[in-house]
Amino acid sequence: MDKKKLLLIDGSSVAFRAFFALYQQLDRFKNAAGLHTNAIYGFQLMLSHLLERVEPSHILVAFDAGKTTFRTEMYADYKGGRAKTPDEFREQFPFIRELLDHMGIRHYELAQYEADDIIGTLDKLAEQDGFDITIVSGDKDLIQLTDEHTVVEISKKGVAEFEAFTPDYLMEEMGLTPAQFIDLKALMGDKSDNIPGVTKVGEKTGIKLLLEHGSLEGIYENIDGMKTSKMKENLINDKEQAFLSKTLATIDTKAPIAIGLEDLVYSGPDVENLGKFYDEMGFKQLKQALNMSSADVAEGLDFTIVDQISQDMLSEESIFHFELFGENYHTDNLVGFAWSCGDQLYATDKLELLQDPIFKDFLEKTSLRVYDFKKVKVLLQRFGVDLQAPAFDIRLAKYLLSTVEDNEIATIASLYGQTYLVDDETFYGKGVKKAIPEREKFLEHLACKLAVLVETEPILLEKLSENGQLELLYDMEQPLAFVLAKMEIAGIVVKKETLLEMQAENELVIEKLTQEIYELAGEEFNVNSPKQLGVLLFEKLGLPLEYTKKTKTGYSTAVDVLERLAPIAPIVKKILDYRQIAKIQSTYVIGLQDWILADGKIHTRYVQDLTQTGRLSSVDPNLQNIPARLEQGRLIRKAFVPEWEDSVLLSSDYSQIELRVLAHISKDEHLIKAFQEGADIHTSTAMRVFGIERPDNVTANDRRNAKAVNFGVVYGISDFGLSNNLGISRKEAKAYIDTYFERFPGIKNYMDEVVREARDKGYVETLFKRRRELPDINSRNFNIRGFAERTAINSPIQGSAADILKIAMIQLDKALVAGGYQTKMLLQVHDEIVLEVPKSELVEMKKLVKQTMEEAIQLSVPLIADENEGATWYEAK
């Protein structure tokens, strides 16, 4: 007889989590009647994921019945102070209940009791009847119910990631038993439920007390023996409050429910009515997947484990997935791969198949349909397989359609209704427990991932076509992935000995600064401790408290606080200098050494699908954040050198590309004229805004202020922000901005128009159809709406600038290949491209690179690329 399994879901909590998991896409989730549906959709995905994984024989979703419960009768402020439930969420609740009805899932609520009490009562009844129980919630209150029969899962991220609490896991994570978890909440209180707890007792202190005394009762039995302290005083004063909090936090496992376990038998959905409901909600993908279970998927797609390969297993229409165990494909291992052919799915962990002549020849001669081409190209290069540019990259396609969430396969599955795939953390585990399971289970996981890709590829293609974004994928992002893969494989030589020399020099500087700080302080202390520094500055040295704010951990010594204090306290300037050099030392001078591989190079990874504007970022290590303003930061670039002695590094950097894009997009005649005439744009702006007649009369301060206004406008800066940047009053800053818009009316018109369009469409686009979703553009919250409006203004500018650089890189790579040059692109940092150029090609290459970048696209103003070359990146910059 199959084991009886009961799934108990805290419906109110999980629905709320589902709402906010898809909140950034709020305006995309509306049905034809205008009803928001993101919570309904997310709730359904959570349910389907749980049904697939838990396979319950019995199930119940419990809801809170209302604000008045037996707890509010004993403590009127219980759950008081909670923010108002968003109307967009409230309107979906009746439909969540309707969804449950159609899915054949019992739901229940009980006057005067909370969902937790219903769950707790059924949990104990089910234990007595021999059930295995899984409880699911969005908050941790229910953890107290875990025992040898009950697992409590708390949703962590999105709609499919949960943290499973058992007694062993709770002990491992917190050192507590389930009963002690109640006592911890009694001590800490709970802001979300407005449970008071004991004043200034947090999690760390609460756990310490419970480990010492065993329970809340034990703490108070031993309180007389505690040392005199503020904590002891608070415990004594708040004793009544602590025991009230324990009562409030304890789940009632004997609630007078009117249902029994026999009422919770799960026999599946009412397919016909559920399909109609999906139609009403506009859930097309869910409708298509309605009759599919994981077993159906595996059987329908003919999953086969492969140890040998033949030509009839391969097709130009095949879709591939290559599984990396880890994140860094330059160093971590390929562990298996899967591919489709017609209706068949194949999966293998036999990596030697990559050397099979049939397979290797196919891979190298076919433009693959694949997930994450750049990763795959770099990985397979390690096996001697050299891929062509891709036919279709599913990861990049998803990224172009939505930048709100990540682009992992599990996320794609959640978004498009494939409920049979578990996320990698759930499947492999995490931390020291992360491991590949037995072979058949592992390969089935790869097959499920591939099934998601097979099912979603046509959906993504259709949506890209509807958005007019196929050209963006085929002509920009996919060719760029090929270029970036080649750059990553090439890497750049970084001389460790140079970094070691810098490390030694910096250590002397840090030691000297430390001694100078001690002398000014009149004592020795830990300069790296914000707490000790705060006490020194604001208590011992008596610096003005209005410059800082005090939190639970002490006085704020953040950079903005210290910069305001620096003019009045010499020690603060030294501390700022110390922090800057210490940061450079630890993060870059020492940090970069760990990323130099056996070939003497750093192989950074360019992340193509992270930013919402389309800009590239780099990780492992991040080379885009190497400090450029400080000389000590710039010196790090001396360690970056060419691979060959007869070569140099050539750096080519777009000049003021975002302002040039702004001129083109806004069609402002004055800005266009200044760029067309080759004028210094900041000097020209200063003349127009400050009423200066001649360029010669523009001071350095005038130009600096004009530059701040120019770039501030690009980022939608406020008068408050500009006043902080320039150290002037808000009134002066507002006058600058008002005058700027008077003198450059095209820019003001652009800003107004792009915000209007964003409100209508819910998104903005670059010159090349790259979209930035703006779900908050019509928010009733002024601050949230204001941020969305600034984003609407900036994204087409910043995104178009990023796109132009991508076009230049693609065209430059084509030119290098066509000309048979030895020159290689090595790095892309912000608006800069760094190449290694043989000296014999330098004259020709400087001309080619400059021409390619400046002619990447025709704007109404010229694009300008500035070049420098040198024996190191430092000299080239």
UniProtKB/Swiss-Prot annotation:
UniProt keyword terms in alphabetical order: DNA damage, DNA repair, DNA replication, DNA-binding, DNA-directed DNA polymerase, Exonuclease, Hydrolase, Nuclease, Nucleotidyltransferase, Transferase
Gene3D superfamilies on file: 3.30.70.370, 5' to 3' exonuclease, C-terminal subdomain, 5'-nuclease, Ribonuclease H-like superfamily/Ribonuclease H, Taq DNA Polymerase, Chain T, domain 4
Enzyme class: transferase
GO biological process terms on file: DNA-templated DNA replication; double-strand break repair
3'-5' exonuclease domain residues: 302-465
InterPro entries in UniProt: 3'-5'_exonuclease_dom, 5-3_exonucl_a-hlix_arch_N, 5-3_exonuclease, 5-3_exonuclease_C_sf, DNA-dir_DNA_pol_A_CS, DNA-dir_DNA_pol_A_palm_dom, DNA/RNA_pol_sf, DNA_polI_exonuclease
SUPFAM superfamilies cross-referenced by the UniProt entry: 5' to 3' exonuclease, C-terminal subdomain, DNA/RNA polymerases, PIN domain-like, Ribonuclease H-like
Keyword Phosphoprotein: no
Keyword Acetylation appears in the UniProt entry: no
Its EC number(s): 2.7.7.7
Database matches in SMART domains: 35EXOc, 53EXOc, HhH2, POLAc
5'-3' exonuclease domain mapped to chain residues: 177-270
TM region(s), chain numbering: none
Single GO MF descriptor: DNA binding
Substrates-to-products reaction catalysed: DNA(n) + a 2'-deoxyribonucleoside 5'-triphosphate = DNA(n+1) + diphosphate
Function field: In addition to polymerase activity, this DNA polymerase exhibits 3'-5' and 5'-3' exonuclease activity.
PANTHER family: DNA POLYMERASE I (PTHR10133), DNA POLYMERASE NU (PTHR10133:SF27)
Subunit structure: Single-chain monomer with multiple functions.
Family label: Belongs to the DNA polymerase type-A family.
Protein name: DNA polymerase I
Organism: Streptococcus pneumoniae (strain ATCC BAA-255 / R6)
Lineage: Bacteria, Bacillati, Bacillota, Bacilli, Lactobacillales
